[in-house]
UniProtKB/Swiss-Prot annotation:
PANTHER family linked to this entry: 30S RIBOSOMAL PROTEIN S20, SMALL RIBOSOMAL SUBUNIT PROTEIN BS20C
GO biological process assignments: translation
GO cellular component, one term: small ribosomal subunit
A Pfam entry, by short name: Ribosomal_S20p
Family classification: Belongs to the bacterial ribosomal protein bS20 family.
Organism: Nitratidesulfovibrio vulgaris (strain DSM 19637 / Miyazaki F)
NCBIfam families named in the record: S20
Lineage, broadest ranks: Bacteria, Pseudomonadati, Thermodesulfobacteriota, Desulfovibrionia, Desulfovibrionales
Protein name in UniProt: Small ribosomal subunit protein bS20
Function field: Binds directly to 16S ribosomal RNA.
Keywords for this protein: Ribonucleoprotein, Ribosomal protein, RNA-binding, rRNA-binding
Length: 87
């Protein structure tokens, strides 16, 4: 454990940030799973709604630096393609 006051503070801050990032990544995984599940069920309306939610979550995570913006764009693109293929 750190001995200096500033190092202790930095450690606490890094733990907070890690928890926040972990929560955001979990949220991303959950919304992506929801879209994929709706696509597998071939439920176009639910898939479209889930895609909208997923796009929002991914864009927010990218904006906050949790994931890279190109990774977010790639995921959104692939999910949009999957939802578009549902008949």
């Amino acid at each position: 454990m750190a001995n200096h006051k500033s190092a202790i503070k930095r450690h606490k801050q890094s733990q907070k940030r890690a928890a926040r990032n972990r929560a955001a990544k979990t949220r991303i995984k959950n919304v992506v799973k929801a879209v994929r599940a709706a696509v597998l069920q071939k439920d176009k309306d639910t898939a479209a709604q889930a895609l909208t939610a997923a796009m929002s979550v991914l864009d927010k995570a990218a904006g906050k630096g949790v994931i890279h913006w190109k990774k977010a764009a790639r995921k959104i693109s692939r999910l949009t393609k999957a939802v578009g293929s549902v008949e």
